[in-house]
């Protein structure tokens, strides 16, 4: 089993446990250059809010700061944006789905920023 398969196996187990809870899910995906966050409905079929470093507004802000989307500063910005969008959609509490990634670096920065912006998990 290689690194990617192990990550996907961990993600699958987490998603099964979150589905049993029947709560909204904040899913995070990261690549070398970008980070993405989505809030899914409790049934898991609808995306209620999303934010990523591909959005034009985010890219403009990042160009002023660092010029890149694959760093902790970008993850912090995405964490704040996803919390604001989730609250606007009426979501106060979510389950955090790190998609099998270690809770470290960019994933941790996104989670901490979302918590500071008022999202509970």
UniProtKB/Swiss-Prot annotation:
Cellular component annotations (GO), alphabetically ordered: cytosolic large ribosomal subunit
Annotated family: Belongs to the universal ribosomal protein uL18 family.
Name of the protein described by the UniProt record: Large ribosomal subunit protein uL18
GO molecular function: 5S rRNA binding; structural constituent of ribosome
Keywords: Ribonucleoprotein, Ribosomal protein, RNA-binding, rRNA-binding
Gene3D superfamilies, per the entry: 3.30.420.100
Any one of the GO BP annotations: translation
Pfam families registered for this protein in UniProt: Ribosomal_L18p (PF00861)
Purpose: This is one of the proteins that bind and probably mediate the attachment of the 5S RNA into the large ribosomal subunit, where it forms part of the central protuberance.
Signal peptide: none
CDD domains: Ribosomal_L18_L5e (cd00432)
Domain of life: Bacteria
Subunit note: Part of the 50S ribosomal subunit; part of the 5S rRNA/L5/L18/L25 subcomplex. Contacts the 5S and 23S rRNAs.
């Amino acid at each position: 089993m290689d690194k990617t398969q192990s990550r996907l196996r961990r993600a699958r187990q987490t998603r099964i446990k979150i589905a049993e809870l029947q709560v909204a899910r904040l899913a995070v995906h990261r690549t070398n250059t970008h980070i993405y966050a989505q809030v899914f409905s409790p049934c898991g079929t609808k995306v209620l809010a999303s934010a990523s470093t591909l959005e034009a507004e985010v890219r403009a802000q990042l160009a002023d700061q660092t010029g890149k989307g694959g760093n902790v500063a970008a993850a912090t910005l995405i964490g704040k944006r996803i919390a604001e969008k989730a609250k606007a959609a009426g979501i106060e509490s979510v389950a955090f789905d790190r998609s099998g990634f270690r809770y470290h670096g960019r994933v941790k920065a996104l989670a901490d920023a979302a918590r500071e912006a008022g999202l509970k998990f």
